[in-house]
Each structure stands twice: as C-alpha cells, then as structure tokens.
C-alpha cells in the first residue's frame, strides 16, 4: 500500500515536471519510480527519451528559418529510448500516442520531414482529445501541430497545379493556427495549476515557481500564421489572427509576445489600413477587402473548430474601438504600459544587452504613438506619454528630441527649451536643435538673452554650412531687434538696432535666395526709418516669394510712410485676396481706409472682421447681452478651428511681436480682468485667449474710428464690448480715456490714462495722451517729464515729439520747442499708417 502511494506521488511529480518543462529533474524521478514500481520500464524509456530531447533542444535551440542539420550523435540515445518504448508495445494507448509525438518531433529535428508527417498520420493528430488531459499533453499536441506545419512548409508540392499550392498553404496555416490556439490553452492551464499549487502549499517554503519558456515550436505556432497571411497578401485574416491572440486571457509567459503582437498590429492599422477598409474587432471581417490580394480567393473565416479553446476577455461595458487610429492608440498604450513595467534600467555591464532590447522595444512603441497621436493633434497627451519614456532616455538623443518636439507642439515652450538644452548636449554638432530653441525663445517665451545664446550657437555650429549660419544670423538679428524694442534708453535702442541690421545683412549675404533674410532686413531698415533702402529689400523678398503675407504688409506700410495711401490700400487688398482671414492685415486696412476712403468704409471693414471672427471660432461670447453696438449681431457660430488663422499677440496692438513690457502687461491684465469678471459675475471666456483678444481689438478699432468722426456714444458702446472681454486691458482703459477726452472730461480722461499706465508703464499712446491732458490742465512740468520718458521708449513717435514741443513752447523754451517740432516733422514724413512693429518678428 505504501509503495502504491509513493508511486502515485512520483507520477504526480513527474507529470508536474513535464507540464512545467523541468526536464533536468526527470532522470532522477525516473530512477525513483523504477526502484519502487515494477513494469514501468517502457514508461521510463519514454520519459528519458523525451527529457534528453528537450535538454538537447534547450542547449542547442532551433532557429526560425534554419533547417535541422540531419542525424546527430547526441540524438542517437534519444531514438534508442523511444524505439524501445514503442517496439515493446506495453504502454497504454495515450502513452503510445505521446511516444509517437516525441518520435515525430525527433524525426523533424533530424531533418526527415516526410517520416514525421507519416507518424502524425498514424497517430491521428486531428483526433487527439483536448479535454480532461494534463497540461503537458496540450503542450505536446500544440508542438505537434507546429511541427507538422513546419514539415509541410519544407516539403515541395507534388504537383504544380495552383489549387494544390493554395490547399497546401491553407493546410500549413491551419496547422499553425491550431498550434497557436492550443498553445494559449496550455499556457493558461499551466499557469492556473501552478497558482493552485502555490496556494495549496504547506507553510514551509518550497521550490520557487518556475518561469515558463515558450520554446521554438510553441513560439512558431503562435507567430507563424499571421506572417504567412501577410506574405500571401491576406491582410484581413492576418489582422483577425492578431486580434484573436490579443483577446486571449494573458499569462506571464505571453506578456512579451502580446506586446510584440500589439505593436505589430498597431503599425499595420496606422500604415496599412484606412478608415474605409477598417472593421471593428467585434464584427465579422468583410468577405472581400481592398486590403487583400485581388487574385486570392476564399472567405476570411476559420476553416476549423476545436473542442476546447483558450479563455478570452469578456464582460459588460468593455471598450471596443470604432476606427483604425483608435484601435492603434489602444494597442500602443497597452504596449507602453507593458514596456514601462518590464523596463531594464540597470547600467551594469551584465545587463547591457537586456537594457538595449528594452530601450529598442520602448522606442518603437513611442515612435508609433507619435504617429497615432500626431494624426489626432493630441500633442498634450503625446508629451505626457513621452515624459513617461524619460526613464529610458539616459544618453538617448532620439527620445529626448521626440519629447522636446511634443512639448513644442503642445505649447509647453518653457519645458521644451529645457529639454532642447539636453538635446544640444547630446548632439552638439546639430544646428537645427539650437535653432528650434531660439525660435521658442524669440516667440511666445520672449527669453531674449537665451535666444541670443542659442543664435550664437547656431552661427558657431553652422560654420560648415552657409544655410545654417545664415539662419543663425537671422535669429541673432531678430533677438537684437526685439531687445531694441524692449530697451528703455534711446542710446541702447539705437545700438541694438545697428547690431540687428548688421546681423540681417550678414544673413542676407550668406543666403541671398532666402526671402526671410531679405524681408527682415527690409523690416529692420523700416523700423530705423530708412524707407528707400527698405523698399528695395522688400521688393527682393517679394521676388523670391511673391505671396508672402508679411512682405506684402511691409510693402503697404512703406508706401503709407511715403503717403501713398491708396497704393498701400491696394497692396493690402491684394494680400487679403490671398489671406482673407489675416487679422493683422485687416487692422491695417481699417487705418488706411480711415485715411483715404473715410470712416464709413473703415466701419464696414470692422463689421466684416466681426463676421470673419464668428465664422472662424467655435466659441461663445461672454459679452453677449443684447446690448452695445449694433455693428453686428453677436451670435457666435462655428465653421473652422482657430489654429488655421494668423494672429498676432494683441497685448499691444502696436507690435505684432511679443516684448517684455507687453508680456508683463498682458499677465497683469489677464489676472485683473479675471478678478473683475468674477466680481461682475460674467461668464468665463472659453478656450484660448487669442480669439478673445482678437475680438476685443476689433471692437477697439471700431471705437477708434468713431472717435475720429466725433461720435462718443458709439465709441463708448464699442469700448464696452471690449471691456466685457478684458475690463483691465490697458488698451481698453486708453480707449475709455480717449472717449472721455472727446467729451471734454479731462480729469476723467487723466484717470483712465493713469490706470492704463499703471498696467503697462511703457504704453506710448497713453503717455502721449496723458501729457496732452496735463498740458490742457496747465501742469506743464509733469507733462514734459512724461513726454521725455515716452521719447526714451519710442524715439520715432512724431506725436510725442510734437507734444513735447507744445509743452516746451508753453513754458517759454522756444529754442528747444523748435527743435522738437522739426524732429516731429522729419519723423512724420516717414511715419507709416500703422507702426512697422505690428508685423510679427518670429523665426
């Protein structure tokens, strides 16, 4: 009785070792079994033959695509064991089947494919049961189907008939699909059994759970079917096979395989499938699909059934993607999660190979995520994904650069610059990286000192190629030009303007065919009031690129500086025919129409701008109250996304480029406006600020036209519309001051101008009008002080020089007043209808 119990325990342990592929333990267990039980010699032969074959394959694994090398001495002993077990015929039928399956596997390893197929035919492979069998038997059957598929692939078709070729291909694929399905079932079963054993184990510690390995045959069964589908031009079935594998409940052994398959399927969905040819994972595949080879015939459904299948994920409310990008994104996010979970980050030399594989796998996933999210414009989400990739990114330029670009696209410019600095460290010879950093610093960030450093780096790195060197000088010129705008001292302004001019001249000489170099050189000359020279270069820019909106705008402003207002307006109209939604051009058109066509035309343009605004933005105007100007209905409609429209930064309408004072002022305005709005309980503004700032500027331009024709009531209504959007904007407060001044309320006007200057201390128009009001009130000394400060801020404002002359004359200082009047006359002769700085200065 004790002997029978011991034998039962040994048999159970042997079955467990076979299921878990612990082949090194089998010989010792066989010895114990032979010593305790009689008549187990044949079983021992089977077990020893199987374990030695598996040990041999573990030491010298087969490779996909490589042919077995024929009989080998090491396998002779395996054949002896198996032949002995089969020849005596004392084994039970199921163990005889197992012996034949192992023999067929050995025959394949030795290279005798035909004999292996004969053995499978004798065994009746398709009739072997899958229910009520131990896990190791499932593995053996799965490997048998994979081996049969390999043998069929190796052997030539006996006839050249195309139908036989198609039938053979289908037989091969069916073998691999069955192998894969049964392999998944085996892996689920063995994991369930192992977990049960761990839970039932006594408190004393036992052997650690054994990590399963797929091995050559199971891996072939799981991965070969879809490869053949794609090779044969049947993308529909290939995608279907991928989905079947992914829907099976995951095991520890299949985690890496699932990640690979998910990544491959995502790549096919993104690169090989359009929305029209997509079908949902829960739908039947189309009978005929444009994805497939048109010469291939047959249904896109399975040609077999199995009595037992692997468990699949199921349940209520499970998410199911509805289009290809959505499914690809789901797959990639799952792959990303797995890549992060299994990341190898250790820097010790022994882990170098694993770390490189982990990095390569993660990089492919993040590259595909970039494609998927980039298509949807989801740059915020992409930057978050790539931020998680930073754990892999030590000394890896590609991931750092992808992260920087995603931050740029998401509008996170400050972080993007910091990441680009790391990219520059990793790849110091690439001039495009500091050029991108300079672009961000010159643009919305307005970090001009940083921009100057990056621009100089581009110049230094670009010594080898004139193209990058020219771009470096262009960035340097823009930096100096913007620094000149920011400078509060006239001498510093002039020095920086000279440096900007030299940089633009160098850029133009290095790249004479670059329209941007010619344009910015012309713009800098215009800002310095060298009008004839500027005209020459802007015409060069237009010869190089005749439809450039900024060049056309500059040409119009230069013509207006020469008092050719009608010609300037014609140029603006021509530019608007190409760019009808460019608000910078439209604002200039309002000013020019006021000068040469009268206020009615200007007001019609304001009305037209409001129509364009409401046709472009999917926003709701918080100022809609049924009150205010009757220029236009204030119902906001939607037609297109706002990112297709060209917008300046309207924190200061006199400069299309951001500068230090306007950055500070706009932040103060936004904070104060939000406080004011909350106190007034008005609805919050939805979406980005730019559209609302544009709308406010439209109303302010209309108010300015009404002030010009002496209509304070209409001007007040328009100003109120802007105030409903930004009650603490210095532009709104300045316009309120102008309306009060028009009504003759000088004390009220003074208060409005002072409030505007408290928010934006360098707003020249507010300084000039405040000084004029103080002059009216007889406060000459204070008016003179304010005007002298204004001259330091903008030495080309002829209104300021004229006002200073009037104040000095009122104080009896006629000589100084005369000099101011002459300067004002000289500047007015070259003054454009709109300041040249309204044109954006960006890379």
UniProtKB/Swiss-Prot annotation:
Disulfide bonds: none annotated. The modification Phosphoserine is found at residues 160, 202, 625, 629-630, 673, 677-678, 681. InterPro entries: Endocytosis_PI4K-reg_protein, TPR-like_helical_dom_sf, TPR_2, TPR_rpt, TTC7_N. Signal peptide: none annotated. GO terms for cellular component: cytosol; plasma membrane. It is found in: Cytoplasm, Cytosol; Cell membrane. TPR repeats lie at residues 97-131, 219-252, 363-396, 397-430, 479-514, 516-548, 549-582, 696-729, 730-763, 765-797, 798-831. GO terms for biological process: phosphatidylinositol phosphate biosynthetic process; protein localization to plasma membrane. It holds the Pfam family TTC7_N. Keywords: Cell membrane, Cytoplasm, Membrane, Phosphoprotein, Repeat, TPR repeat. SUPFAM superfamilies: TPR-like. Component of a complex required to localize phosphatidylinositol 4-kinase (PI4K) to the plasma membrane. The complex acts as a regulator of phosphatidylinositol 4-phosphate (PtdIns(4)P) synthesis. In the complex, plays a central role in bridging PI4KA to EFR3B and HYCC1, via direct interactions. Component of a phosphatidylinositol 4-kinase (PI4K) complex, composed of PI4KA, EFR3 (EFR3A or EFR3B), TTC7 (TTC7A or TTC7B) and HYCC (HYCC1 or HYCC2). Interacts with PI4KA, interaction is direct. Interacts with EFR3 (EFR3A or EFR3B), interaction is direct. Interacts with HYCC (HYCC1 or HYCC2), interaction is direct. Association with the PI4K complex is strongly reduced by TMEM150A. This is Tetratricopeptide repeat protein 7B. It comes from Mus musculus (Mouse).
């Amino acid at each position: 009785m004790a002997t029978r119990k011991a034998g039962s325990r040994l048999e159970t342990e042997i079955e467990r070792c076979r299921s878990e592929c612990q082949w090194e333990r089998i010989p010792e267990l066989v010895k114990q079994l032979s010593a305790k039980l009689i008549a187990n010699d044949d079983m021992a032969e089977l077990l020893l033959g199987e374990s030695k074959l598996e040990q041999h394959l573990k030491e010298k694994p087969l490779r996909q695509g490589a042919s077995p090398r024929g009989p080998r001495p090491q396998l002779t002993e395996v054949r002896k064991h198996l032949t002995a077990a089969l020849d005596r015929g004392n084994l039970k039928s199921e163990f005889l089947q197992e012996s034949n399956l192992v023999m067929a596997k050995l025959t394949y390893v030795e290279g005798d494919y035909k004999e292996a197929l004969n053995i499978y035919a004798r065994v009746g492979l398709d009739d072997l049961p899958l229910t009520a069998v131990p896990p190791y038997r499932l593995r053996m059957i799965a490997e048998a189907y994979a081996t049969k598929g390999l043998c069929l692939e190796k052997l030539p078709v006996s006839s050249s008939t195309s139908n036989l070729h198609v039938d053979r291909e289908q037989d091969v694929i069916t073998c691999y699909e069955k192998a894969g399905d049964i392999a998944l079932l085996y892996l689920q079963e063995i994991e369930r059994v192992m977990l049960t054993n761990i839970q039932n184990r006594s408190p004393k510690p036992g052997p650690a759970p054994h990590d399963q390995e797929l091995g050559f045959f199971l891996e072939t069964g799981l991965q070969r079917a879809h490869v053949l589908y794609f090779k044969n031009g049947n993308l529909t079935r290939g995608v279907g096979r991928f989905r079947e594998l992914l829907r099976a409940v995951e095991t520890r052994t299949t985690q890496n395989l699932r990640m690979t398959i998910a990544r491959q399927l995502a790549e096919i969905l993104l690169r090989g499938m359009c929305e029209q040819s997509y079908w949902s994972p829960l739908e039947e595949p189309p009978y005929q699909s444009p994805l497939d080879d048109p010469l291939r015939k047959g249904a896109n459904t399975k040609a077999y059934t199995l009595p037992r299948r692997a468990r699949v994920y199921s349940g209520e409310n499970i998410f199911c993607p509805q289009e290809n990008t959505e499914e690809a994104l789901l797959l990639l996010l799952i792959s990303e999660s797995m890549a992060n979970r299994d990341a190898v980050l250790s820097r010790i030399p022994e882990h170098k190979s694993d770390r490189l594989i982990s990095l390569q796998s993660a990089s492919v996933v993040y590259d595909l995520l970039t494609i998927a999210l980039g298509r949807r414009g989801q740059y915020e989400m992409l930057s978050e994904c790539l931020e998680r990739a930073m754990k892999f990114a030590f000394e890896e330029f590609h991931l750092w650069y992808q992260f920087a670009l995603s931050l740029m696209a998401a509008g996170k410019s400050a972080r993007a610059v910091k990441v680009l600095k790391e990219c520059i460290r990793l790849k110091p010879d690439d001039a495009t990286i500091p050029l991108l950093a300079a672009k961000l610093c010159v643009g919305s960030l307005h970090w001009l000192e940083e921009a100057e450093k990056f621009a100089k780096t581009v110049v230094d790195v670009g010594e080898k190629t004139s193209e990058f060197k020219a771009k470096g000088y262009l960035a340097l010129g823009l930096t100096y030009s913007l620094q000149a705008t920011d400078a509060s001292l006239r001498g510093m302004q002039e020095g920086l303007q000279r440096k900007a001019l030299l940089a633009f001249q160098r850029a133009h000489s290095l790249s004479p065919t670059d329209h941007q170099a010619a344009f910015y050189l012309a713009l800098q000359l215009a800002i310095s009031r060298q009008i004839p020279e500027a005209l020459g270069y802007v015409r060069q820019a237009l010869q190089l690129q005749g439809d450039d909106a900024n060049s056309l705008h500059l040409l119009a402003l230069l013509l207006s500086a020469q008092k050719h207002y009608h010609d300037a307006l014609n140029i603006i109209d021509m530019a608007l025919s190409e760019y009808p939604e460019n608000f910078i051009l439209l604002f200039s058109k309002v000013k020019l129409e006021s000068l040469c066509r009268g206020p009615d035309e200007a007001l019609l343009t304001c009305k037209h701008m409001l129509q364009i605004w409401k046709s472009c933005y999917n926003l709701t105007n918080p100022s809609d109250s049924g009150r205010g100007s009757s220029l236009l209905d204030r119902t906001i409609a939607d037609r297109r996304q706002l990112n297709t429209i060209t917008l300046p930064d309207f924190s200061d309408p006199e400069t299309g480029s951001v500068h230090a004072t306007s950055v500070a002022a706009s932040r103060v305005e936004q904070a104060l406006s939000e406080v004011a709005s909350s106190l007034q309980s008005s609805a919050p503004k939805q979406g980005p600020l730019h559209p609302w700032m544009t709308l406010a500027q439209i109303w302010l331009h209309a108010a300015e036209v009404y002030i010009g024709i002496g209509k304070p009531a209409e001007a007040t209504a328009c100003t109120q519309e802007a105030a409903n959007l930004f009650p603490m904007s210095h532009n709104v407060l300045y316009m309120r001051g102008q309306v009060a001044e028009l009504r003759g309320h000088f004390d009220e006007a003074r208060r409005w101008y002072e409030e505007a200057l408290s928010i934006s201390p360098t707003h020249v128009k507010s300084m000039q009008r405040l000084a004029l009001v103080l002059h009216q009130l007889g406060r000459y000394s204070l008016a003179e002080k304010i005007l002298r400060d204004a001259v330091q801020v903008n030495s080309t404002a002829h209104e300021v020089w004229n006002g200073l002359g009037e104040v000095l004359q009122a104080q009896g200082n006629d000589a100084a007043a005369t000099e101011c009047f002459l300067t004002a006359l000289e500047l007015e002769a070259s003054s454009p209808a709109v300041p040249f700085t309204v044109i954006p200065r960006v890379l």
